[in-house]
Amino acid sequence: VDLVTNLPPLTWALVAGAAVVGWGLSWLWRWYRQRRVRRALVTAITAVGSDHLVDVLVPDGMGSSFHLDFVLRTPRGAVVLDLRDVRGNVFGGDQMNEWTVMDGPHRYTFVNPQSSLYDRIAAVKAIAGDMPVEGRIVFTRRARFPKGLPKWTLMLDSLARDFPLIEGGTPGGPDPYDLPWQNIRNAVRPSLMAQARPVSG
């Protein structure tokens, strides 16, 4: 004990500095890992569309706006995606106000995301004109649905199967979705909620 208490100030400063550096390196590694996972996830999702928008705000028609995690341009039209990264067993249904997540001893609920998805689809439809607009709530592979998936909900791994990327366009003519998609692009703006819900590794 005496040896520790008698250490010179310079030694204490070096110890403190090493601790700060260690904490900083640990934080940087976690940040880098999370960023790498996020980038891989975004790449997997956006690969489904021929074009995409990520983390944008769309006008709601009443002076405000909705945050959109993803909007994909597909051969079927535009697809609004609400990304959910939760771990554990998810119990949800079309008529339930709240969905429950059970992860070992941990249990929590979140508001049924279907109604907010409908609002976002309607907002994009108001801009897209004749372009069909669909929506899905996408869960990462960390989630499981023991009692089945609710309506408009799918797992990330099945996204490409549900929306196969086929070369669009009318043979010998322009793609009828070019103008509606450009209208969507022109109407949205970057969202301040970008990265607000980090994706865990």
Placement of each model-derived feature along the sequence:
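Amphipathic, interface-forming alpha-helical segments with heptad-repeat character
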Residues: D85-T100
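Surface-exposed interaction regions that form or flank ligand-binding interfaces
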Residues: V1-F66, R73-A78, R87-N89, D103-G201
